[in-house]
């Protein structure tokens, strides 16, 4: 490899945002905490606050005002013209909003009552929940988990710049916690000029492993960035998934070409729009490429199998600034005795080993390992143990 790079890809919008309080600022705000009105925010808002502050959501410096919100919902762009596909907002009830005055600083507290951030209130506005659901999630069905959140949240959005008072270690995965500035430096230290990001909220099976390794053939490094924020109640817990990832990497991946780090974001399940969002966030972490597979960030049957890939063609490459690597569904092909997709397999469905998620979960509950062509035995054993513990 040629001489090590001195910098990574530019962050989205050109500047990596840092809204984390210095020790001096933190002391100032904590000393004056008694004078702040305080607003309790949910876990998703806490993770959004954190990601804004550390630059994961660059160029955002706070929760969106009404003009940016409407522009994102309708056009997938900020009013500046920068591509942004998911509204990042702070909902409160109308009753709470009435007690707040534009221009004041608000203390943001988490579910335990701990003061985690400051919002300089620039605006408060109402919004159309049905329109947000229709445009962002492509459905108004309240059974959709993302739509359910929108319908159930407060009727007023608060907007303004934020400050995160303290960057706290993750209670479970502190050793895997890399902020965008950290991951960018890690890529430079490794001499990686090109890095592919992979988003996941599920255990990695052979199909995922295959497309990651296909991507590794054309880039310098893999940034495995599993989501550990809020997900659906029936998703595999984050600690179990992380154990699967660590075991898999240790045994089956080139250790010098993979970095595993947590993504503190919450899932929206917004399918195509969230695929764009996930790519832009990984760009902020320093990735030059991003893997988009089948039904990325989807749920149920709300989106077409490859809608999350097609949406990338709605934007000019320079407006995204990160290259999507699009893969079809992978499977084990018995005829060639290896992993393939319909692009590379000469066989029909009869020679493909493919198991539905429902079938796999049923096997794991019964203590049965799926075939090694579908998942690595080490991963299967971790999942069996976890599922059986849940059932006790």
Swiss-Prot record:
Keyword ATP-binding: yes
Alphabetical GO biological process terms: hydrogen sulfide biosynthetic process; sulfate assimilation
E.C. no: 2.7.7.4
Leading EC class: transferase
Keywords assigned by UniProt, alphabetized: ATP-binding, Nucleotide-binding, Nucleotidyltransferase, Transferase
Keyword RNA-binding included in the entry's annotation: no
Pfam families in the cross-refs: ATP-sulfurylase, PUA_2
MF annotations from Gene Ontology: ATP binding; sulfate adenylyltransferase (ATP) activity
Pathway: Sulfur metabolism; hydrogen sulfide biosynthesis; sulfite from sulfate: step 1/3
Catalytic activity from the UniProt record: sulfate + ATP + H(+) = adenosine 5'-phosphosulfate + diphosphate
Sequence similarity: Belongs to the sulfate adenylyltransferase family.
Descriptive protein name: Sulfate adenylyltransferase
């Amino acid at each position: 490899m040629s001489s090590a790079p001195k910098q990574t890809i530019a962050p989205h919008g050109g500047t990596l945002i840092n809204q984390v309080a210095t020790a001096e600022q933190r002391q100032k705000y904590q000393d004056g905490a008694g004078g702040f009105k305080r607003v309790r925010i949910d876990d998703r808002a806490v993770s959004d606050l954190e990601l804004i502050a550390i630059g994961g959501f660059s160029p955002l410096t706070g929760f969106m005002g009404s003009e940016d919100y409407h522009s994102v919902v309708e056009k997938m762009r900020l009013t500046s013209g920068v591509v942004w596909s998911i509204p990042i907002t702070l909902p409160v009830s109308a009753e709470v909003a009435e007690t707040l005055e534009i221009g004041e600083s608000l203390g943001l507290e988490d579910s335990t009552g701990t003061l985690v951030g400051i919002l300089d209130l620039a605006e408060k506005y109402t919004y159309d929940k049905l329109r947000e659901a229709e445009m962002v999630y492509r459905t108004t069905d309240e059974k959709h988990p993302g739509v359910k959140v929108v319908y159930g949240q407060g009727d007023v959005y608060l907007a303004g710049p934020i400050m995160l008072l303290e960057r706290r270690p993750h209670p479970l995965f502190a050793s895997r916690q890399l902020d965008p500035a950290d991951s960018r430096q890690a890529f430079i230290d490794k001499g990686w000029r090109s890095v592919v990001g992979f988003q996941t909220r599920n255990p990695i099976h052979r199909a995922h492993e295959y497309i990651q390794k296909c991507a590794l053939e054309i880039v310098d490094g893999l940034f495995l960035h599993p989501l550990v924020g809020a997900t659906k109640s029936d998703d595999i817990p984050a600690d179990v998934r992380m154990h699967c990832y660590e075991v898999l990497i240790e045994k089956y991946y080139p250790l010098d070409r993979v970095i595993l780090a947590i993504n503190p974001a919450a899932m929206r399940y917004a399918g195509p729009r969230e695929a764009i969002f996930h790519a832009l966030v990984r760009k902020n972490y320093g990735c030059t490429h991003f893997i988009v597979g089948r039904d990325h960030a989807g749920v149920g049957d709300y989106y077409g199998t490859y809608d999350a890939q097609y949406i990338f063609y709605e934007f000019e490459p320079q407006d995204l600034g990160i290259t999507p690597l699009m893969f079809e569904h992978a499977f084990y092909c018995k005829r060639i005795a290896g992993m393939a997709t319909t692009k590379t397999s000469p066989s029909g469905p009869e020679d493909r080993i493919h198991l539905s998620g429902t079938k796999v979960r049923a096997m794991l509950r019964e203590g049965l390992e799926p075939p090694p062509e579908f998942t690595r035995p080490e991963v299967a054993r971790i999942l069996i143990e976890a599922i059986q513990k849940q059932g006790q």
